[in-house]
Amino acid sequence: ANSFNNSIAIDTEATGLQIPERDKLSLIQICDEKGNIFVIQPNKDNYKAPNLVSVLENEKITKIGHFLRFDKSALEFFLKCKIKNIFDTKIASKIVRTYTDSHGLKNLVQEFCNKSLDKRQGSSDWNKDINELTDKQIEYAANDVVYLHKIKGELEKMLIRENRIDIFNKCLTFLDTRIALDQSGFKFDIFEH
């Protein structure tokens, strides 16, 4: 926990998108500010990970993710923790990149890092033992976190420049409520007419 300074990029892989109803948390990927990547397979018997939980709950460390609505929900549900101090690149992109409707991680990596992400391994059996995952699967999982620090930096500059940082921060505050709605079965937009 002491090796992480100001921020980490986080992502998860799961057996599907129905958490907590059906699916399980399979992998957790972390990238520190220096580009060191950690791919962690939680103990599926009890999901106890006290060192990881202490990092996730540390308010001094910003947790950067893309569509944290899913990852934060899965991590908090399975690890029984409360993740503090987040930056969601998907929310930031939707608020500040109004010149496009393309807000996927692949699009952000292309625009800000000039790299092409291969998303073909996305639908994989992530629940098998980590030693049975292919190099391509591990590379896919790692690529979901390796670019997030740079993307955050670029989006944050844009949010400040366009005077949208306050509304972005309000969205991050609301995310806990959105996750609670999801976990209570209200996956639709409750504000819709």
Per-range role (PLM):
Residues 73-76, 106-110, 146-153:
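A broadly conserved amphipathic alpha-helix scaffold signal in soluble, globular proteins
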